[in-house]
Amino acid sequence: MQFQLFEAEQAFAGQVEEFIAQHWLDVAEPRRRLSAWLNAAGSESLRQQWYRSVVEVGWSVPHWPIEYGGCDWTRKQLHIWLSACLKYQTPAVLTFATAHVGPLLIEHGNAQQRALLQRMATFEESWCLGWADRRVATDSYGVNTRILRTPREISISGTKTRVIDGMTAAWMMCVTGGEGNEPNENRSSIVLLPLDQKGVKRDPKAALSTGRAMAEIVLNNALAASWATLDVPLDELRRRLTGLAANDLSALADSAALTEQVRQLKDRVAADPNMEFGLLRDCDALAIEASGLLGMEQRAITQGELPLPAVRLRAQTLWGKLSELQIAAFGYYAMPFVDSALADNEGAVDNTRPVGEMDMTMVMRRMLSPAIATELGVDLHDSLAQEVLGLPVQDE
C-alpha cells in the first residue's frame, strides 16, 4: 500500500513538473520570469498568463473545499504543488486572498461574503490587509480607524499604513476600532471593504525587497455593505496570520523556496573571485539545514508527528540565516527596504548620538526581525508566548 501511494505521488509530481514547464518555464526566458516573480513593472501580462493557466487546470485554490473550487488532494499532493511553484519561482499561487481571506470566509462568512470567493479563486480580484494605523507604534495592535453603522451600510474613516499590495488591491480586510466616539476596548471589527470608490485615497510607499509595493490608504467615509463585517475575533485573525491554525497546511513549503534561494546565492558567491570561501561553506551548511526542514515538513504533513508551529518556527530561523548570508555577501543592497524598520520604540543603542541620526545596528535588527520577515507585521513567537503564558487577548 505504501509503495502504491509513493508511486501515485511520484506520478503527480511528474504531472506538476510538466505543467510548470509548459505554462511557465517554456513561455518566457529567465530574465522575464524573474521580473514577473518579483512583480516588476511591465511583467503583469506574463503573471496573468500564468494565472489563467492555473485556473484552467483547476489548481488555483487546491486547499479550499471542493464546493468552493478546491481539489480533492492529499496533504502530500498540496505540498508537492506548492513546493514546485516555489522552486521554479512562479507568480505566487498563495496570495493574501487565497491563503487567508478565502478560508476565513468559507469558515465564518455569510452568504453575501462567500459570493466573493469566486473572483478570488480566479485571481480576478486581489486583497490586502489594512491593520496598522498611522501614528500607531510599529508593533502595536492598537487601531484608531473608526466606523459608523447604519441599516444600509458601514462608513469607515482612518488611515492605514504599510499596506502590502495596497496600490493594486480591489478589496481590503480592514481592521477597525470602536464605533463613532466610543472607546476601542473590545470594539474591534473586521470589515470587507471595496477600495475602488470615492472615499479611498492611495499613496505609494517604499516596496519590500520582494518587489511587493506598499501603500498608505486614507479612508474618508469609505463605504462597505451592511453585511460586510466578518464575524471573527481579532485574536483569531492574528492566529491565522501567524500560522497557529492547526489545519492550515498551505504554508508548509518553505524548504523548496529556501533550497532554491540558497542555490542561487551560492552560484553568485562562487562566481565572484573576491568573495570569502567561508561564505560558500555557510551556503552548503544552510542547504543541509533546508533539507532537514523538508523532512520536518513531510513529518508534519504525512505523519502528524510535529506541531505545525514548530515547523514554521524552524523555517523562520532558516530564513533569518539566509538574510544574514545575503547581507554578508552583498551588504546594504541585500537588505529589505521597509520604512517602518527605521522606527523603534526602544530608542537608539547609543543615546549619546544626535537626535535623528540613523542607528544602523538598530535598523539591522529591525530589518531581520520576524515581524518584518512575515510581511504582515505579526510574529509567531508572540502568539505562542501569549498562549503558553495565558495572557489575556487584547483586541483594542
Language model region names:
Residues 2-5, 201-293, 370:
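Glycine-rich beta->alpha junctions and the first turn(s) of the following alpha-helix
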Residues 2, 80, 330-396:
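Glycine-rich phosphate/cofactor-binding loops in nucleotide/flavin-utilizing enzymes
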Residues 48-123, 165-171, 290, 294-300, ...:
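Internal helix-loop-helix
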Residues 123-132, 175:
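A short, Trp-centered hydrophobic/proline-enriched beta-strand micro-motif
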Residues 145-148:
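A structural signal for short hydrophobic beta-strand segments in well-ordered beta-sheet cores
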Residues 1-95, 116, 338-347, 351, ...:
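Amphipathic, small/basic residue-rich leader segments at the start of a protein or domain
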Residues 153, 157-201:
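A short core secondary-structure module
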Residues 28-40, 274-280, 287-350:
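C-terminal helix-coil-helix/basic helical segment that borders enzyme active sites and/or dimer interfaces
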